[in-house]
Amino acid sequence: MREEEAAAVVTVPQAGRDGEQPGPPAGLGCAAVRGEPGGGGPQESRKQWKKFLYCEPHKRIKEVLEEELYIKRDECHIKHPPAVALEGIWSIKRNLPVGGLKPGLQSRNSLLPQAKYYSRHGGLRR
């Protein structure tokens, strides 16, 4: 969103009051909305636009909200540390055959993954 769009929020046009006819915001390029000749008729040119300015919350309110966000994030990390959470899902120790081999008996083929076959009748087979 551009800065001009963030500063002014435009609502539906209302019928003109006191003969004022301010133009629509700069971001709208439709001829019918602007009330330009040949683009919507005289009724469109009599409508007035309401503008609302966005005001940020007070600095202290923003700080309190950020503190609450950080507290919730820290509580989540204490309950479920990322390393421990992943350990339950996938583990090198459990999923890969590493270690347990004697250094003198290692061969090239023993380090390769062994073929595993699944059968719906017998389960997992090697």
From Swiss-Prot:
Subcellular location as annotated: Cytoplasm, Cytoskeleton, Cilium basal body
Entry keywords, A to Z: Cell projection, Cytoplasm, Cytoskeleton
Top-level taxonomic group: Eukaryota
Protein's UniProt name: Uncharacterized protein C11orf97 homolog
Predominant localisation class: cytoplasm
Keyword rRNA-binding: no
Residues covered by region (Disordered): 1-46
Gene Ontology CC annotation, any one: ciliary basal body
UniProt xrefs under PANTHER family: CHROMOSOME 11 OPEN READING FRAME 97
Organism: Bos taurus (Bovine)
